[in-house]
């Protein structure tokens, strides 16, 4: 009985060893789908190590577990990709590396046959990504480096840059802030290699919204921006101390704005295309104030300026210069109204002095020049020609004393040929020099007497003829007295 049991036991052991030996044998098996397996089996299932090939070119070599690809192995895919690493349930699972046909690689964790978890991907174009993946897409925290020098270090969502990030650009610029759908969006800061810094809001990858822009030269802008350009309400503080606060359009001052210079200059008003244009008010460093129209940064059109001493000018301006028609009132009470050129009286105009003197007529380069009428404080009036501020040429004066002269003038004085009517009725017609009878002339006295001859310094010095009216004989010495009367009656004709 005992011998029989030993025999049965020995037989069982032999059969078991035979089966084990059979499981360890490398067997080649072809399946209905055309697949071919070459490797070991256990209990009729692929188990251990084996190679499996499909007609489409797929090939797997590695560990099997009861008919399942599981463990370490190498898979070659029809598209030329090669995966080497861990498997489970016939798929890459755990740590593994795949090399794609184009040369790109991924090494890291896999889940359910997909690139999911932490890993490093190097793409055929040289781009390198290290970080989190989900379903073969960048997802979570990761760093992408481009051969050009572009580096993105931040969060990703399903392959898209999204969330907080730090981006370094090929030129050395650095952005730190929010990213949405691959573009800079929300709050962020950009620092450029040349020193430019922008801190503020972004939209669609562009500077857009409210922010602070610091230029390399030290100028600082705070306010609204659009598409990277100043647009809307804002304030610029310049490195030299100047300040502009107001509206911008397309990166230039436009609309209403105030500019304050470090030197005390201040402008408040309208702007266009970066220049002072339209209505506005300027206060100059010396205290002068201009209010009116501007064009091209200069007073142009109608405007009024008030100077520190109280003087004013109101009228036309051209390119920052008083030119055209206007009215000037000076601190000493003098008033001029008329034409101007290059800030000087020019053309037709009227000048009135506080003492009552008034000139109306032509002007040139700030002086009375041409035809005009001068009225003096005592009521005297001159009508005629002026040259460089003086009576010169043909003119007539009527004095308050009753004296009247019509003739030529030189350097403000009666000089040349003319006719003088004296208050006592005497009339002289002839030559004058420096306001006095000088040269050839005829005096017709109110008495009817007429004398012709040479005159010197206002007196008759060489009588050529004399006509006496039919009157009683004159007293002895009367002729001399008449000459004296003539000299005394002559006025001092001045401006």
Describe the function of each predicted region.
Residues 36-47, 59-70, 82-93, 105-115, ...:
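Conserved anchor residues at repeat-unit boundaries in beta-strand-based tandem repeats, strongest
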């Amino acid at each position: 009985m005992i011998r029989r049991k030993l025999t049965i036991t020995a037989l069982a052991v032999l059969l078991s060893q035979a089966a084990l030996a059979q499981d360890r044998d490398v067997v080649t098996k072809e399946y209905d789908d055309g697949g071919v397996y070459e490797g070991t089996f256990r209990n009729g299932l692929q188990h251990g190590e084996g190679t499996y090939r499909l007609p489409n070119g797929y090939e797997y070599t590695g560990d099997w577990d009861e008919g399942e690809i599981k463990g370490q192995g190498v898979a070659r895919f029809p598209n030329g990709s090669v995966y080497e690493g861990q498997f489970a349930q016939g798929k890459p699972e755990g740590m593994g590396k795949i090399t794609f046909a184009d040369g790109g690689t991924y090494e890291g964790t896999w889940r359910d046959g997909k690139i999911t978890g932490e890993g490093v991907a190097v793409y055929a174009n040289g781009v390198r990504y290290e970080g989190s993946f989900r379903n073969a897409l960048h997802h979570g925290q990761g760093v992408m480096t481009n051969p050009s020098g572009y580096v993105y270090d931040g969060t990703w969502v399903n392959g898209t840059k999204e969330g907080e990030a730090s981006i370094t650009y090929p030129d050395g610029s650095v952005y730190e802030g929010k990213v949405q759908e691959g573009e800079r969006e929300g709050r962020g800061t950009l620092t450029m290699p040349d020193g430019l810094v922008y801190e503020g809001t972004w939209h669609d990858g562009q500077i857009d919204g409210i922010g602070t822009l610091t230029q390399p030269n030290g100028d600082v802008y705070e306010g609204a921006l659009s598409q990277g350009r100043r647009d809307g309400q804002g304030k610029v503080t310049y490195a030299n101390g100047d300040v502009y606060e107001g509206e911008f359009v397309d990166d230039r001052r436009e609309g209403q704005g105030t500019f304050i210079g470090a030197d005390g200059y201040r402008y408040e008003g309208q702007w266009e295309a970066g220049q002072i244009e339209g209505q506005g008010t300027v206060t100059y460093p010396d205290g002068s104030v201009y209010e009116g129209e501007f064009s091209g940064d200069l007073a142009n059109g109608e405007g009024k300026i008030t100077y520190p001493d109280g003087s004013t000018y109101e009228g036309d301006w051209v390119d920052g210069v008083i030119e055209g028609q206007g009215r000037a009132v000076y601190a000493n009470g003098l008033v001029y109204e008329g034409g101007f050129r290059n800030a000087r009286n020019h053309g037709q105009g009227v000048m009135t002095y506080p003492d009552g003197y008034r000139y109306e007529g032509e002007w040139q380069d700030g002086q009375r020049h041409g035809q005009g009428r001068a009225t003096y404080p005592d009521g005297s009036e001159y009508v005629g020609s002026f040259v460089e501020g003086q009576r010169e040429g043909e003119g007539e004066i009527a004095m308050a004393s009753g004296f009247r002269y019509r003739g030529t003038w030189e350097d403000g004085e009666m000089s040349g040929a003319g006719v003088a009517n004296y208050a006592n009725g005497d009339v002289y017609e002839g030559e004058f020099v420096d306001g006095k009878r000088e040269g050839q002339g005829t005096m017709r006295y109110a008495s009817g007497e007429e004398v012709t001859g040479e005159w010197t310094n206002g007196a008759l010095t060489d009588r050529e003829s004399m006509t006496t009216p039919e009157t009683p004989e004159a007293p002895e010495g009367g002729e001399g007295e008449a000459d004296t009367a003539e000299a005394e009656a002559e006025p001092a004709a001045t401006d």
